[in-house]
Structures are given as C-alpha cells and as structure tokens.
Amino acid sequence: LWRLDPRTGKRFRFELPTTVVQRFTLSEGRVPRVVFFGQTGTTSRNAYVADLTSSRPKCTPFGEVSFAKALGDVQVASCTPWSYRRSDRDTVPGFYFLPADFDATKKYPMLVYYYGGCVPTTRELEFHYPLSVLANMGYVVLALEPSGAIGYGEEFAARHINTWGKRSADDIIEATKAFMDAHPYVDRKKVGCMGASYGGFMTEYLQTRTDLFAAAISHAGISNIASYWGGGYWGHTYGETAQYGSYPWNNPELYVKQSALFNADKIHTPLLLLHGTADTNVPTNESQQLFTALRILGRPVSYIQIEGANHVVTDYGQRVKWQQTIMAWFAKYLQGDAAWWKGLGFKD
C-alpha cells in the first residue's frame, strides 16, 4: 500500500503486516484511515483498519471478520522469500513453501510454479493455485517471477516482447537448478512444473527446451502462437504488444521456433493439458492440436476438458475436481501413486 502526494509527486510505502492487500477503502475524516483485506503466505485473509498518519501504521483486526478462524489449529506450510542471481547478474525473484512437518534429512519432490498471463505470483495463502496445500501434500513448492512479469519495473516487463518465452525459460531453468543445488533435500529426479494461460504456454515451451521436469501441467496454454494470434477474445490485441511489429508473414521464425506445436517431437515429459470448453481467451484448439501431435508421436500426454468453463474454472464442483486432477497427476508421476488418478476415472 502506497501513499502519493499529488502536489510533490513524492510517494512512500506503508509497512503492513500483510504481503498482499485486497479490496481497501479509505475514510474521508480528519485522520486518514484505511480498511483492507490482507494476507500473507502463511496467514489467511483478515480485515484490518489502519491509521495512515505514520509510515508504519498500527493495523488492528477489524471486528470479528477473520477468514483465518476457519483454519483453526491447522498447520500451514512455511513460506520463505528466495531469489536467484543469473549468470548475467540479473535477479529472478521468488519464494518457496515447505511442508509443515518438513524434515531436512528427507528427500522431497518439487513443484515449480510461474505466472499465469504475465501477472506475478503473490505471497498469499488463498492463492488461485493452492501452493501451501500442495506443499503440505509432501512437496517443496517453488514460485518464480521470471522475466516479463509486471510489478518489477517497465524494463523487466518489456523483456517479454518479441521473445515469447525464451528469456523466461532461461530464468526458470537456471533458477530451478540453482534452487536444487542450494537445497539438497529436493529430489532432482522428481520435479514438476505448472502454469496457466501464458504460464501454460511456458509449461509447453519448457518441455521443448529441457528434460529437467518429470511431470508438467498446462492449463489453457498456447501451443501455436500463429493460431492464437488470429483467434481468441484478444489474441491479436495481445499480440500487438507481445510481438510488436512481428507477424506470421514477416517474422515466421518467431511464430514457429517459440511454439511447442512445431517442436512437439522434442517433448518427452508426461504432460497434462487442461482447458475449459468455453474459453474465449485461449481457444481450446491450442490444447487439442498439441495433444494430437503428442499422441501421434507416442508421447505421454493426457487432455482433459472442463465442460462449460471459460479461461478460469469458477464453478465450485468443477473447481474441486480440477484441483484434484492437478494433485493426482503429480502424485502419479512424482510420488509414485497412480491410485488417485485412476480413482478420478481417467485413463493412462
């Protein structure tokens, strides 16, 4: 939460007990106050009221509004900031979760998550992908903010333009290896990755670049930049920024070289493709055509459609099964337990 003085242009950041601020409202009284929802990677949402006359305001829980009470005595995974200095001395920020019953003498499979769209992953317990829950299922969970993510300055975000994953993939691969080197409790042979939308594209593209991962999940991913450019709710509009000045007819190399579909023969990692049948952002064909290619090649791939779902799965019942599907896929390939996957009615 920041304050901006419109007269001087000066700004400063308030020091709050939360890492995420959600849905705030300001008072209009003589003493400036704010009421906001906030949370961290280890605490659930709570409502706070804060006096903004100080840069370190006292934040008081507001009344009896506390989602955290629903957790009771449930132990949550720990959440720790972590960053990696690339070989070119640039920094890749991130954080990681460890199970509540973590034992450093044991080996753990690891999941790597990166942005959906180019929106950075925030340190919050109630995230769209339940990273803390996954950690407590026996994983180390590493969340990275690779090049192209917004929130780290204009230059950092602009690295996404006309690269379509190249620099971001370098960030993810280098950072994942560096994390494993620094944390010997990670089982290097049991590392999975996942992302959605542009993050789904990254999942697919990464498998054409490395054999680092033992399992991968792409939700609503883009497999063919050319077909996405001309379809979907905003493919062309997005492309006007993401590949500014580059079109299939004047820069075909970008569209082919960076698309997983045209490099499908390089993919050997077991890959799960998830897609809502009513996705207006990324058409379902983006998953269908990669699934077809990998099946022709005889590679381990599964494709599951969520009936009637748009770009994000919002129906409660579908969302529960969607989450279970993700968990079951990783349990099958990273924990050696296929019972959950089979129990959901899916075939190999």
Residue ranges and their predicted role:
Residues 136, 143-348:
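Active-site-proximal cap/loop segments of hydrolase catalytic domains
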Residues 37, 114, 219:
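Conserved residues at the C-terminal ends of beta-strands
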Residues 1-106, 118-137, 177-181:
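Peripheral, non-catalytic segments that deliver or gate enzyme domains
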Residues 109-113, 141, 303:
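Hydrophobic beta-strand anchors of alpha/beta hydrolase catalytic cores
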Residues 116-118, 198-199:
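Acidic helix/loop microenvironments that form the catalytic cleft of cell-wall polysaccharide enzymes
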Residues 114-116, 275:
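The conserved beta1-alpha1 loop
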